[in-house]
Amino acid sequence: MLDVLAVFAGGGLGAVCRHLLTFVPWKTVGAVEFPLATLVTNVLGSFVIGLIVGVVATRGISPRAVLFAKTGICGGFTTFSTFALESQGLIDRGAYAPAAAYMLLSFALGVGACVAGQLLVGRLLGRS
């Protein structure tokens, strides 16, 4: 039951952080409204989950703390369903190039940020 509460608390924190990003005055890219907030959210969440994995690999933290941070915070913060909906919206409006750019950037930057987070922890904590 404590594991469930850890995920619940982390998920709430992640969701609130995600909501707070909606207050950032994002600029529109070009003539098409580009979903920059979701892209930033998912890349940042990927970086954070990479940090968590790096810390677990180098220092180890309790399984409950991993559930709180990885499943809870990152799960509540990142927004794959919003990514899918916004991608479909761009396609529906005929904005094929921005849709392709958004999907490719989300994937490439998300994976890259996850790797960067793990590498950063390795460097900071002395693991090569």
Predicted regions, residues:
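Membrane-interface helix-loop junctions in multi-pass transporters/channels
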Residues: M1-S128
